Design a protein with these regions (language model features):
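Solvent-exposed loop/turn segments connecting transmembrane beta-strands
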Residues: 52-60, 88-94, 121-128, 145, ...
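Transmembrane beta-barrel strands of outer-membrane/channel proteins
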Residues: 48-50, 79-85, 101, 115-119, ...
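Repeated loop/turn-to-beta-strand initiation elements of outer-membrane beta-barrel proteins
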Residues: 42, 74-79, 110-113, 145-149, ...
Length: 264
């Protein structure tokens, strides 16, 4: 899987062009999402990718992720784990880990409540870890056999712990916590019998005097090769208005790979 390090574009123009074309060809495209059914069964997928180069260029990239989800008539729970590593000319350009747990309970056909928790580490960005939790309300705008689109809003709390103390909110800090709003939208699309797309956009305005802002956008396109194997291309953007000294505010990635459906 390819990754774009903060502030840099991929060294494979053909791959980037192909991925962009795929993304632009769809109405709205994170890593491949599990397609659940309200039958109470757990479904799991495993994804991986790697690339290596030696000679004039010395490159290595590895990515792995695991997802599990269970849905009933009234609630849905999901788990996700992801690890990403990339190096160029013997210098690490990406090294992060992400763990998530999400829960949703339907109040009726349109309205639901949600809760989620996230643990995120990004060594390149001096982030030892970020712990986040949020809860709120969502509204299902549309639901069809091929498309669904929802809006959600809530409140949560995030705490960042830094590997090296850095200046955040005008002070030298080892850790930084704040209450945040959670405002977002998410959609899934069945484009063809073998092609699915998903996108999720979330804003996190802080409820403090510093008015910090975070935003995350993730989108993916998945094309099934067999009943269990699929090719995926995904793009991710993370924005932090105050990430600390000598850290880019915007982090972006392009990732390609394969996923394997462990259970159906």
């Amino acid at each position: 899987m390819k990754t774009i390090a903060p502030g840099h574009f991929t060294t494979r123009p053909a791959l980037a062009a192909l991925a962009c074309a795929l993304l632009l060809a769809t109405p709205a495209l994170t890593q491949a999402q599990i397609k659940t059914q309200p039958d109470g069964r757990w479904r799991q997928i495993l994804g991986a990718g790697a690339s290596f180069a030696d000679g004039n260029s010395n490159l290595s990239s590895m990515n792995a992720h695991y997802e599990a989800a269970r849905q009933t008539r009234h609630h849905t729970v999901g788990l996700r784990a992801q690890a990403l590593y990339n190096s160029s000319d013997h210098k690490t350009s990406a090294h992060n880990t992400n763990l998530e747990i999400n829960g949703k309970r339907n109040l009726n056909e349109r309205h639901y409540i949600f809760a989620n928790g996230t643990w995120f580490r990004d060594r390149i960005a001096n982030l030892e870890h970020r712990l986040s939790a949020a809860t709120g309300w969502g509204y299902q705008v549309t639901t069809t056999p091929h498309d669904d689109w929802s809006l959600f809003a809530g409140i949560g709390y995030s705490e960042d712990r830094y590997a090296v103390p850095t200046i955040v909110a005008d002070q030298l800090r080892k850790r930084y916590g704040r209450a945040e709003l959670t405002l977002g939208t998410e959609s899934h699309h069945q484009l063809t019998a073998t092609t699915t797309a998903h996108q999720r956009l979330v804003f996190y305005p802080a409820l403090n005097r510093n008015h910090d802002r975070r935003a995350e956008f993730a989108a993916d396109l998945s094309v099934s090769i067999t009943e269990r194997l699929a090719l995926t291309v995904a793009t991710e953007f993370r924005y932090n208005s105050d990430p600390g000294t000598n850290v880019h505010k915007l982090d972006r990635r392009l990732i390609t790979g394969v996923t394997w459906k462990l259970t159906d």
